[in-house]
Each structure stands twice: as structure tokens, then as C-alpha cells.
Amino acid sequence: MTDALKLDWAVTVPPTVEPIDILELRSTTTGSYLRVDFTDDDLVLTALIKSCRTIAEQICSLAFAPQTIQAIWTMPQVNAGSLSGFKLLYDQDFYQYNESLGANPFSPAPFVLQLPQPPLTAVTLFEYRITAFNAWQTWPATVGSPPVANYVVDTLPSPGLVYLQYPPPAYQYRLTYTCGYATLPPDLKLALLQFIAWKYENRVGEDMPAEIQSQFMGNKVWVL
């Protein structure tokens, strides 16, 4: 396997609740972070919360709040319709590994997809299409009776993983999934508060302070 799948993704349902409440910023509230004792800048603060959260998510490759993402994996042009673009869990020829699966149906799945922007909550839809001109088809989580898993979702790792026993040969695979922290970890929340406060007090487009950037980079997740 020399070529990798091309990954494109987008947020289809953005967070409905931000990880930072505006009341946590105003000095009219006990324990607030910013020294702002008026409500005139509420619109500015609301916009900054969203903007800073989005920037921090891009730096960390994390979802700071619950959201829905749609990701598409495209096979390399020379391998379209084959399985050679998948990341193999084992350094073996696929056909040899497929033979081993026949001998032991409980073997680990040989293929894995890494889902960007953890933490992963759930995969709601797995689709594929043979060519760009074909309609998307649903790939069910299980097949047969008794049911046998086509794929297994693991939400514990970061990034989240989808293991596939034998994915359908196709040009593209599309997954829709939910992800994001229900409650932002304290270190990320503090870094986000500091970022918002800095942006509020420095509105001329200066570079992010190294101290704040290092806090985000210390939590960055790498998708291979």
C-alpha cells in the first residue's frame, strides 16, 4: 500500500451551546474572567466566544463542543475501486489476511478509519459510492442473521476509530458522526478563556501569544 485515502470533512451541524458562557466573562458575575462590568459589549463577546472556539478547535484538532461532522474518504485515482488506500492494521498482504479471517472470524478487522475532531460520540451513518456519478449507498453496521458486524466503532481512542472487516470496494466513503466535549476539560477551558480575554483586549489582529498557543498545542491530536 503506497497511497493513502484523501480525507475531507466539514461540520454539518455546529454547536448549539458554546463551551464558555458570556456570564463567565462579565465582571458583574461572581468568579468572572474579564473585567467588564457592562453589557454593551455582549454582542462582541458572543462573537469572540464562537470565533476563538473555532480557532482553538483548528489548532488542537478537537471538537470543543457537541457537533455533527461529515467526513469523506476518497480512494487514490490509480486505486479507485480497490482497497489499497486503506490503512492496514497489520503489515500483511490483504488477501493473506482475508484468508486468515476465514479461518478465524473473530480476528481483528484489518482496516481502520480515523475520525477527525475527537472526542467521538457516535457514528450515525456510513455510506459509500462506486463512482462520483453514483448515488450514495448505506453500509449497515451489521448484516445477516444472526447479525455479523460490518464495522465497529471505538470512541475511546483520540481520534476515534472505525474498524472494518471488509469494506465494499468503492471510490468514496462518507461517514456522518457526532463528536465534541459535553464539558470542556479544565485546562482547555482556561486556555480558551485566556484566548478570548486576549482577543477582547487586542483587536488589531496581532499574533496569538506563545503561552496561549502552547497550551492549545499541548492538547493537539494528530490524525495520521
Where are these regions (language model features)?
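Divalent metal-cofactor coordination and adjacent catalytic microenvironments
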Residues: M1-L224
